[in-house]
Amino acid sequence: MAEYSQTGILTALLLFTVVTVKDIYVGRNSVTQQENTGPDINTQRQNKHTFYTGPVLKFQYCISUGYSKVFQEYSRSISQLYPDIRIEGDNYPPKPINKYLGNFLSYFKLLAIALIVTGQNPFQMFGMNTPRIWAWGQENKIFSCLMAFFISNMLETHFLSTGAFEITLNDIPIWSKLQSGYVPNIQELFQILDNHLKMNQADKMNFPSP
């Protein structure tokens, strides 16, 4: 029974460590890929802009808030009603300080779980008294790893979440959740698009070509 419990503890702790390392690695790898492919993407977009002169509808939204699904649903509906509109979507970047705090928590989570798994006491290394909570965590490794994992993830989400759902048409803002406080329903968005497209057509008619 003791052997089974020890094996289960080691397996659970190893799982937490692997998931945490994967979380950090995947996040870093995606950022690196975006940076490496950035010039190519920008070149492709510039080439598309040289051939495409129609309206461009751009969404910037909070991915961690679950707005990716909303963007996909709205994109399908808008494409059916306005097939000439090109739709783009991207994550709304958090503030730099929040981004750095989120990255710090990712590494802190990994370090905390690694110390719990190996049984190391960082307080003794610095000549400090061991807090009771750390001694309790060593006696309850699975539960303490759970707490470190989920609390760190909760704080990461808090710092990286912007709550944004911003919409621009030809680089002109037509909706901002950060200002209005809510995401428009699809009918509201249709009405907004219709009004702006009519205004753009009227402006083109008022300026005759030379």
Swiss-Prot record:
Tissue-specific expression: Widely expressed in the embryo.
Cysteinyl-selenocysteine (Cys-Sec) cross-link site: 62-65
Post-translational modification note: May contain a selenide-sulfide bond between Cys-62 and Sec-65. This bond is speculated to serve as redox-active pair.
Cited InterPro entries: Selenoprotein_Rdx-typ, Selenoprotein_T, Thioredoxin-like_sf
Any one of the GO CC terms: endoplasmic reticulum membrane
Pfam family, one: Rdx
Similarity remark: Belongs to the SelWTH family. Selenoprotein T subfamily.
Protein name, per record: Selenoprotein T2
Protein species of origin: Danio rerio
Gene designation: selenot2
